[in-house]
From Swiss-Prot:
Pathway: Carbohydrate degradation; glycolysis; pyruvate from D-glyceraldehyde 3-phosphate: step 3/5
Catalyzed reaction equations: (2R)-2-phosphoglycerate = (2R)-3-phosphoglycerate
Top-rank lineage group of the source organism: Bacteria
NCBIfam families reported for this sequence: pgm_1, PRK14115.1, PRK14119.1
Positions contributing to substrate binding: 8-15, 21-22, 60, 87-90, 98, 114-115, 183-184
EC number, UniProt record: 5.4.2.11
Record-given protein name: 2,3-bisphosphoglycerate-dependent phosphoglycerate mutase
Protein's gene: gpmA
Amino acid sequence: MPKLILCRHGQSEWNAKNLFTGWADVKLSKQGIEEAQSAGKKIYDNQIEIDIAFTSLLTRALETTQYILAGSDQQWIPVYKSWRLNERHYGGLQGLNKDDARKKWGEDQVHQWRRSYDVRPPRESEEQREAYLKNRRYQHIDHRMMPYCESLKDTLERVVPFWTDHISQHLLDDKTVLVSAHGNSIRALIKYLEGLSEEDIVGYEIKTGAPLVYELTDDLVVKDKYYL
């Protein structure tokens, strides 16, 4: 039976500081490390054998993947990394304190940027974009595909092709797949997998460092889901 494990990275240093993160590359906090280690132990205790893992290019997800595989004694399995699993790009909000943003733009506007389906936040500056374009981890990507900012809809539109071309192919081979990613890239996968409405998915909360297991039929219809 195909099995998919979705796990949002553990708490990051910027999560702890209440900052918009997006594509900014930050490490796990002490709490985040403990969450990721706990996720690995839960997988180990439940005797789940992972065949392959997918993660993003951002350090907090990469670290979470490493801690999960170490904690479940499966560090040797193949791990594939893709920018398509990166967090939603928060554009000009990245690095700002969320409370300060509410004071500047108002509670309603910030809520709309964070929790609507197809509304984008302000674009990042040209200086910020130039820094991404020069970053080695993105040199292999067509720069025309690099976002200035993203809505959840935009995030889904880059995540789903990666699901179709890569992740789902291993599930169709009856494998157990780990996806260690981010709140919004996981939210996009859940919307697609469960067929949720735009209204339902924007309010869907994703816990940090908590493995969410999907048991699937042979044609990848959700049979059961549960947190470990």
